[in-house]
């Protein structure tokens, strides 16, 4: 499983980390980011609040109250030219399309996806708006509980979410 994750970090695609609220998604993601920093990757995060300060990572905090939302923050990606982008979540179709296009520009995207269980995930991803997302997932990490984490390869994700 670790090799699947490391391979996904080194190749363009979307790494999606799923789980229920407070399941440890952010902890797993920050671990992935630290692994990538150690490989000298240029990393940028777009998140509501930076939970930890990560050395050598461009961390960008969103603030809807002053109009600094995901759409505006995404413009900074072009200036930073990161290899890996972590985003906490996507709230608009336009943002999603933008981040999907980053994969075609050889970027790795790490994103959180809230799902209480596998059935919930399948239901949420069953809508046609997610077809492109599903095709770009290179690795999926699903946190069932603190003691149960499942890692899916691109092929397994495609079969499971079809």
Language model: regions and residue ranges:
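Short, flexible helix-loop junctions that flank or precede catalytic/ligand sites
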Residues: 1-162
């Amino acid at each position: 499983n670790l090799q699947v994750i490391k391979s996904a970090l080194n190749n363009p695609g979307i790494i999606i980390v799923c789980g229920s609220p407070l399941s440890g998604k952010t902890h797993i993601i920050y671990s992935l980011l630290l692994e990538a920093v150690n490989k000298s990757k240029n990393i940028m995060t777009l998140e509501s609040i930076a939970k930890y300060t990560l050395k050598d990572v461009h961390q960008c905090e969103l603030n809807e109250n002053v109009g600094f939302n995901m759409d505006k923050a995404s413009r900074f990606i072009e200036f930073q030219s990161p290899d890996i982008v972590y985003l906490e979540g996507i709230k608009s179709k336009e943002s999603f399309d933008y981040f999907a296009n980053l994969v075609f520009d050889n970027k790795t995207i790490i994103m959180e996806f809230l799902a209480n269980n596998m059935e919930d995930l399948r239901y949420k991803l069953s809508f046609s708006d997610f077809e492109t997302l599903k095709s770009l997932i290179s690795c999926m990490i699903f946190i069932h509980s603190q003691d149960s984490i499942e890692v899916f390869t691109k092929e397994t994700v495609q079969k499971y979410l079809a």
